[in-house]
């Protein structure tokens, strides 16, 4: 998909970031029998990329910080801290300046019990909740969500929501969860524009892009309700200079996601 898209938008740079999951770094040995190294899988996927597509080595940056709170225990996502290290790896790949994490104003929401509890109903998980750490954009930002590619039906959106009380919904802190299409505008002044193509791992990553890009577009191909989306045309019409695919390692085997994405890219 990335190779196909890159061939259609030669004036834009295309990057692919595959995010490892918690299991790669913290999974008990007895549960890893028969599972393949995600690092090896990521490397194999990147070898299939054409020269005009850059694979982002988020894995190594995340691996350097495994003593930090990079993944939730009760949920299948990475934390904002884990997403930051992936963002740092992207900046290095793209030749962009990455702001140190301690330069962002931060906060947290306590008592988050996520998807792993929902699947298992484990009392042990319930008794040991996570917290959701967030990092606020350093610049003035605004955001809207849309259901059409021409972006005529905008609804206001919060980039970071700091007041979510439902214990199972606190990952919605980041861009209010999964929307078909989002446009975010930052006063960072770079003049750069990026399209982030993602599933839910990208939600925690998206706010950091506002530190580097004046406009950040976020597309979730799983939300097939979006009308009229042709990604090459969208990139051209909006003057987007950078496209970043951010997905966790299992997404390439998700046929629904890949079919929707390929339809939006076109043959």
Q: Positions of the model-derived regions?
A:
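Extracellular glycan-modifying ectodomains
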Residues: 1-267
């Amino acid at each position: 998909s990335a190779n196909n898209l890159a061939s259609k938008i030669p004036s834009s740079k295309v990057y692919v970031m595959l995010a490892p999951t918690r299991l790669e770094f913290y999974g008990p040995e007895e549960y890893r029998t028969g599972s393949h190294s995600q690092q090896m899988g990521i490397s194999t996927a990147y070898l299939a990329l054409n020269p005009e597509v850059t694979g982002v080595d988020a894995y190594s940056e995340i691996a350097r910080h495994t003593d930090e709170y990079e993944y939730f225990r009760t949920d299948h996502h990475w934390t904002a801290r884990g997403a930051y290290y992936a963002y740092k790896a992207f900046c290095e790949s793209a030749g962009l300046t990455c702001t140190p994490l301690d330069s962002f104003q931060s906060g947290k929401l306590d008592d988050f019990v996520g998807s792993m509890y929902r699947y298992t109903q484990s009392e042990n998980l319930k008794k040991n909740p996570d917290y959701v750490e967030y990092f606020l954009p350093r610049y003035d930002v605004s955001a809207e969500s849309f259901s059409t590619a021409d972006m005529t039906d905008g609804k206001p959106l919060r980039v970071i929501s700091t007041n979510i009380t439902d214990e199972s919904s606190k990952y919605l802190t980041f861009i209010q969860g999964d929307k078909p299409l989002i446009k975010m505008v930052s006063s960072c002044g770079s003049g750069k524009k990026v399209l982030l193509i993602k599933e839910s791992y990208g939600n925690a990553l998206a706010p950091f892009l506002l530190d580097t890009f004046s406009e950040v577009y976020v597309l979730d191909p799983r939300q097939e309700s979006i009308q009229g989306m042709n990604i090459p045309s969208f990139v051209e019409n909006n003057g987007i200079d950078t496209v970043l695919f951010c997905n966790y390692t299992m997404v390439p085997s998700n046929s629904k996601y890949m079919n929707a994405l390929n339809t939006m890219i076109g043959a």
